[in-house]
Amino acid sequence: MAKLDDATLAQLFTEARSHNGWNPEPLPESVLRELYALTKFGPTAANGSPARFYFVTSAEAKERLAKLSSGSNGPKIMQAPCTVIIGYDLDFPQTLPKLFPHAPGAKDWFNDPVAKEWCALRNSSLQGGYFMIGARALGLDVGPMSGFDNAAVDAEFFAGTNIKSNFIVSIGHGTDEGLFPRNPRLDFDEAAKIL
């Protein structure tokens, strides 16, 4: 595997920003499908792929989500062409016969409901990270948010399912509106150890 060039690394990481302001031009469904097609290949435990992606694009759906968000997140949701609810499906073990066929009993690994939920939350968070990097790879900006009422979002969007919300992320073409100066990051020695 070859190292990516500096321009690509800049687009994905070092020059990318979390956006608050958005060009409201809609994103074609084909772009949303292409983004999922990239995201789904990111690794998860036992290939379980517990994340579920609800693409909120209509004015009606945006209003439903915005009213359940905190502070300034509502206007961001209304302005962005798409905000994605990244959830995790507690029924994910039922898909393991398809996704992990070489281990026929894999779904029985998740009989403990607490362990199952932790696995789903952890791996949907991984998938959410892949999703944001995938969006940047396709030339989109992202704006992740966790300021919303999870229980209310679950009731509003996931009623009748075993899906729970993890976080939300707006995607599209960002503007400089509300873009803060880049904040510092922890240095290697503050965040890492080589053992």
UniProtKB/Swiss-Prot annotation:
Keywords: Flavoprotein, FMN, NAD, NADP, Oxidoreductase. Coiled coil: none annotated. Gene3D superfamilies: NADH Oxidase. Its cofactor is FMN. InterPro entries: Nitroreductase, Nitroreductase-like, Nitroreductase_HadB/RutE, RutE-like. SUPFAM superfamilies: FMN-dependent nitroreductase-like. This is Putative NADH dehydrogenase/NAD(P)H nitroreductase CCNA_00059.
